[in-house]
């Protein structure tokens, strides 16, 4: 039996060395070490041995099993290493090849402009307020001194959802909501950026959806000079320290007196050109002193409090600052346009 065990060992190790693939190794393992394998079959005959022979043959059998197992493990490891090397050779990466370009995105121009405006006014002590885009008729019109059937309502071409709900035509409702929430009990210094909607036909200067940012200050002894000073700071920070402003009389139901603000043309420095239509000035926003009736409806005593308000289109500010001639460029997602304004 001793010779038979050694013969099985030699045959098994030789077969393992000649194996060509993992399946062959698995078959050899079953052939020699399995429940019906050669080694197991020989060991079943140990019952016929004497007590003295059994320990000796048992030890030899264990050694043979360990030697066959070791041969199988070594061959398996060798095959796995060869397979890995072959795979790596096929998947070799040429590190000298140029990499794929990484396209770095940037903030949209409108986002940059509104953040710049917000930072400017936050630096002057303003809070940023927000409100719903689906607004009530009351806050969009009536609370702003635009009662039902007021002719100025027609100027805003409103998207109505129901008789009392609409898509806001301006961000002024946020001001009205804030004033009524404060109920005349404390001063206000706020700006409110956001989307607004009007039934305009889209063209180079109009859009059915655009963005506004409006400001409101209410306190004691606020005058038109405070508004002018604030807008002068805004114009110089946004368009350059050499820019000048002028205020022209206008009409807005929310304010009295009302003004429109022009800034000196950046292209011609106020001398007159095609951009400013030879006037030397470009209109950028409207504003005025908060109407006493609006103050009263919001709980503020107009004999004690006064305030100013202003509003501007973010797209218009961006167009003037960066020389964009068509508002539609902001919304078509043309990468050729957008990449012109990526910051380094």
UniProtKB/Swiss-Prot annotation:
Origin superkingdom: Bacteria
GO CC field: cytoplasm
Cofactor details (free text): Binds 2 magnesium ions per tetramer.
Keywords from the UniProt entry: Aminoacyl-tRNA synthetase, ATP-binding, Cytoplasm, Ligase, Magnesium, Metal-binding, Nucleotide-binding, Protein biosynthesis
Annotated catalysed reactions: tRNA(Phe) + L-phenylalanine + ATP = L-phenylalanyl-tRNA(Phe) + AMP + diphosphate + H(+)
One protein family per Pfam: Phe_tRNA-synt_N
Compartments reported by the entry: Cytoplasm
CDD domains: PheRS_alpha_core
Molecular function in Gene Ontology: ATP binding; catalytic activity, acting on a protein; magnesium ion binding; phenylalanine-tRNA ligase activity; transferase activity; tRNA binding
EC category name: ligase
Sites where the protein binds Mg(2+): 256
Cofactor(s) needed for function: Mg(2+)
EC nos: 6.1.1.20
GO-annotated biological processes: phenylalanyl-tRNA aminoacylation
Keyword Membrane: no
Quaternary structure and partners: Tetramer of two alpha and two beta subunits.
Protein family: Belongs to the class-II aminoacyl-tRNA synthetase family. Phe-tRNA synthetase alpha subunit type 1 subfamily.
HAMAP family documented for this protein: Phe_tRNA_synth_alpha1
Name recorded for this polypeptide: Phenylalanine--tRNA ligase alpha subunit
Provenance organism: Oceanobacillus iheyensis (strain DSM 14371 / CIP 107618 / JCM 11309 / KCTC 3954 / HTE831)
């Amino acid at each position: 039996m001793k010779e038979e065990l050694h013969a099985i060992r030699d045959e098994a190790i030789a077969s393992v060395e000649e194996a060509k693939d993992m399946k062959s190794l698995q078959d050899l393992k079953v052939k020699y070490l399995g429940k019906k394998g050669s080694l197991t079959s020989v060991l079943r005959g140990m019952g016929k041995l004497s007590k003295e022979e059994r320990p000796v043959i048992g030890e030899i059998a264990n050694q043979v099993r360990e030697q066959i197992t070791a041969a199988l493990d070594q061959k398996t490891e060798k095959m796995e290493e060869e397979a890995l090397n072959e795979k790596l050779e096929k998947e070799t990466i040429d590190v000298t090849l140029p990499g794929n370009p990484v396209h770095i995105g940037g903030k949209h121009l409108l986002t940059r402009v509104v953040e710049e405006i917000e930072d400017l006014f936050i630096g002057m002590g303003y809070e940023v307020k927000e409100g719903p885009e689906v607004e009530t008729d009351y806050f969009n019109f009536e609370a702003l001194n635009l009662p039902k059937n007021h002719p100025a309502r027609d100027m805003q071409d409103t998207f109505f959802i129901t008789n009392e709900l609409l898509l806001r035509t301006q961000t002024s409702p946020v001001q009205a909501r804030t004033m009524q929430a404060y109920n005349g009990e404390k001063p206000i210094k706020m700006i409110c950026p956001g989307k607004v909607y009007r039934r305009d036909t889209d063209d180079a200067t109009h859009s059915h959806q655009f963005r506004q940012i409006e400001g409101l200050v209410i306190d004691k002894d606020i005058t038109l000079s405070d508004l002018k000073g604030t807008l002068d700071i805004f114009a110089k920070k946004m368009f350059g320290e050499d820019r000048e402003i002028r205020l022209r009389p206008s009409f807005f139901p929310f304010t009295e007196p009302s003004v429109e603000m022009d800034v000196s043309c950046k292209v011609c420095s106020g001398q007159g050109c095609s951009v400013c239509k030879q006037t030397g000035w470009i209109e950028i926003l409207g504003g005025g002193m908060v109407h006493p009736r609006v103050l009263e409806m919001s709980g503020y005593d107009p004999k004690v409090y006064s305030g100013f308000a202003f509003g501007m289109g973010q797209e218009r500010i961006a167009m003037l600052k960066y020389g964009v001639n068509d508002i539609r460029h902001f919304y078509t997602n043309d990468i050729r346009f957008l990449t012109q304004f990526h910051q380094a």
